[in-house]
């Protein structure tokens, strides 16, 4: 009998895992954090009552306010520069009372200073300037209190620029600007409260004992000096009259530029250059009519300065 022998074969597949070696190296690296410049995030010009103002009067205090932001904190702030200048003069013009001012806050010693044009903080009220009371914050206000000169150039339509420049202890800076205008300014003073003449009828070219009347004008534009009378000089008792035209005003005691007075203003000095405390003399003269009743005659004398046009 034939026997068939079957073989059962089992295939055993042995999978071997090969372990590859792992190599590790340190990769050097660095991160550079750049200094972020400070920012002048907002600016304003305000009255001392904290009302926003864009048209300023000379000889009046205003707050020039800048809000400063520093990503670290305000201890990084080194200084703040405030420049005021007419657009006609430009930012880099020399300081002058007419058209350019420079002020500085220095954080290292908390000092407020007028760089120019004044030599003694003439246009900066240092005692009213304000820095933040807490410097650990990232943002707060700095306030310059400025009063512009009486001869500061008047403008319309945003003719002046205020520029705040904020610098930190790394020398990085940011800035912001605001335009504004300056009003016209004129002030007149005279040294006489009255004029007195003792006379007889028929006398001419008589001068008051107070001659000359000294007129002092401060203005930021050219001007005329004008004179007039309220009317004829009228006697207090008999009501007789000395005509206005008998009273004259002149630039000196030799009758230079003399004008006869009326109840309308007449120019005695014309197109005078603007400036501070410009002094001019007025000499008064009277012709006394004949005949004339003996009496005390009075009228009001007027002197004014007006813009030259």
Report the location of each language-model feature:
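Short, compositionally biased P/S/T/A/G/V-rich stretches that sit at domain boundaries
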Residues: 25-58, 71, 200
């Amino acid at each position: 009998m034939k026997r068939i022998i079957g073989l059962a074969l089992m295939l055993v597949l042995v999978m071997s895992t090969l372990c590859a070696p792992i190599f590790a190296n340190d990769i050097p690296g660095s991160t550079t954090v750049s200094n972020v410049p400070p920012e002048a995030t907002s600016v304003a010009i305000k009255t001392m009552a904290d009302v926003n103002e864009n048209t300023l009067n000379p000889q009046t205090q205003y707050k020039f306010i800048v809000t400063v932001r520093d990503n670290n904190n305000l201890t990084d702030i080194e200084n703040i520069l405030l420049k005021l200048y007419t657009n006609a003069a430009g930012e880099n013009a020399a300081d002058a009372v007419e058209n350019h001012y420079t002020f500085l806050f220095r954080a290292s010693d908390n000092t407020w200073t007028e760089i120019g044009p004044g030599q003694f903080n003439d246009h900066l009220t240092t005692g009213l300037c304000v820095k933040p009371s807490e410097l650990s914050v990232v943002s707060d206000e700095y306030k310059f209190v400025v009063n512009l000169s009486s001869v500061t150039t008047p403008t319309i339509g945003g003719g002046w620029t205020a520029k705040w420049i904020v610098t930190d202890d790394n020398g990085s800076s940011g800035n912001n600007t605001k335009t504004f205008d300056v009003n016209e300014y004129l002030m007149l003073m005279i040294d006489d409260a009255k004029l007195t003449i003792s006379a007889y009828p028929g006398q001419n070219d008589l001068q008051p004992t107070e001659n000359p009347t000294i007129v002092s004008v401060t203005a930021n534009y050219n001007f005329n000096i004008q004179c007039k009378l309220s009317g004829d000089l009228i006697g207090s008792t008999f009501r007789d009259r000395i005509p206005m035209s008998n009273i004259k005003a002149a630039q000196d005691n030799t009758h230079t530029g003399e004008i006869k007075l009326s109840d309308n203003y007449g120019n005695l000095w014309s197109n005078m250059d603007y400036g501070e405390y410009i002094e001019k003399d007025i000499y008064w003269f009277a012709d006394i009519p004949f005949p004339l009743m003996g009496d005390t005659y009075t009228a009001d004398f007027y002197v004014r300065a007006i813009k030259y046009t």
